A protein has these predicted regions:
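Extended acidic/polar, glycine-enriched regions
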Residues: 75, 98, 105-149
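Structured segments of extracytoplasmic/periplasmic soluble domains
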Residues: 55-67, 129-132, 185, 244, ...
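Acidic, contiguous N-terminal accessory segments
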Residues: 1-109, 139-142
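Second-shell loop/turn segments in exported
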Residues: 39-49, 115, 160, 285-288
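Solvent-exposed, polar/charged alpha-helical surfaces in well-ordered, non-transmembrane soluble domains
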Residues: 54, 58, 62, 124-127, ...
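Catalytic-core regions of glycoside hydrolase
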Residues: 134-137, 158-160, 180, 186, ...
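An acidic-aromatic substrate-binding cleft motif
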Residues: 138-181
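Conserved, mostly hydrophobic/aromatic
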Residues: 60, 118, 157, 174, ...
Length: 358
């Protein structure tokens, strides 16, 4: 029987041991990597490209039982017999046609070249190479050219290791799964519901593995945007956060977590825990209030004063049960320079047979 939380040990295994099976991969055709090969990268590679090289080397050692050298590439060095990691800035001629930062192009011949639009794309290309070799159960890859880009971004994820607990190996594993952003519950600067967390350190560590960090707001929002002291209050919360942590990619706002004292008559007008006995109307966090756009514009303006390109994500699943007319009315009045996150089918009901509702 496992100990409590022993599953965490598996969550820290980025590369699976013993994937190589010579009885399987030797029957396939393609380019084979052996211990005469090297992994090379630009001499001025940034943290993400260096991480890509070292992660790929670890994959070959742990999963393929091969020990490859990783080193800076010399000018004019041939591509054959090497896995060359680069990006569009270093080798424009090898760049993918896509412009997305995480896009990449993989060329496989007598050598293997992975070129990303940015180093993040190169890293994702290395992950693709790892997945293909894992499927083949050996150090072999199909010859040819492959170009890929993410279907969408960001792909955010909470920690599966423990809420707001992000060991490096767990961040790396999430990146291997195609995630490109971490969500951290934020009650205040460097404070999560579970206590202190150095946000800037998390941002730094995540960035080195090609990941962004979003603040999932747990801030109290007791001020209506029309209150005279509302700007000063939200400056002391969201403004203080982005002033001190400009590396945050953005903020995610969910009704249940950021409810404010809306003046929409369809709601109680107060926070959930402040409801008076007998009040049957929903709290503002659970209704598409007409004044959410006012609140959003106030907070957004404060955040973007410190980070002009901050992604502002507004998530609407809390009022999915409300009639469509009210939900659409809110969407039509939201500012267009934010990201709207919706949860499809959450409140849909299906009737597979008479008397059964799911």
């Amino acid at each position: 029987m496992e100990r409590n939380y022993q599953f965490r040990e598996r969550l820290l295994e980025v590369h699976k041991k013993g994937l190589r099976d010579d009885a399987i991969w030797t029957k396939l055709t393609g380019t084979t990597v052996d211990e005469s090969w090297e992994i090379v990268y630009p001499a001025d590679a940034d943290r993400v490209l260096l991480h890509a090289a070292h992660d790929l080397r670890d994959f070959f050692e742990v999963s393929m039982n091969l020990c490859l050298r990783a080193r800076p590439r010399k000018d004019g060095e041939p591509l054959e017999g090497r896995i060359t990691l680069t990006d569009a800035a270093h080798t424009p001629a090898l760049a993918p046609a896509y412009t997305e930062p995480a896009a990449y192009k993989l060329d496989v011949g007598d050598g293997i070249t992975v070129c990303g639009t940015t180093p993040r794309g190169t890293l994702q290309g290395c992950f693709y190479l790892e997945r293909r070799m894992g499927i083949h159960r050996g150090p072999i890859i199909e010859r040819g050219t492959v170009e890929k880009k993410p279907l969408f971004s960001p792909r955010m994820v909470h920690s599966g290791f423990g809420l707001d607990d992000f060991p490096d190996a767990h961040i790396n594993a999430a990146a291997h799964m195609g995630m490109d952003a971490l969500l951290v519950f934020t009650k205040d600067l460097n404070i999560t519901p579970h206590g202190y967390l150095d946000f800037n350190n998390l941002i730094y560590r995540a960035a080195g593995m090609g990941m962004d960090v979003y603040a999932y707001s747990y801030y109290k929002s007791p001020k209506h945007p029309d209150d005279p002291d509302a700007p000063a209050f939200y400056e002391s919360t969201y403004g203080n956060l982005f002033k001190n942590c400009p590396g945050l990619r953005g903020v995610t706002l969910v009704g249940e977590s950021v409810e404010f004292p809306s003046r929409d008559p369809h709601t109680s007008g107060c926070l959930r825990l402040e409801k008076k006995p007998g009040e049957t109307r929903p709290s503002p966090g659970w209704y598409p209030c007409y004044d959410y756009p006012e609140w959003i514009n106030l907070v957004k303006g404060i955040i973007r004063k410190y980070k002009p390109d901050a992604d502002f994500v507004f998530w609407t699943y809390n009022w999915g049960y409300v009639n469509e007319e009210a939900r659409i009315a809110l969407i039509e009045t939201l500012p267009t320079d934010i990201s709207l996150q919706v949860t499809y089918e959450m409140f849909e009901q299906f009737h597979p047979r008479p008397g059964v509702t799911v």
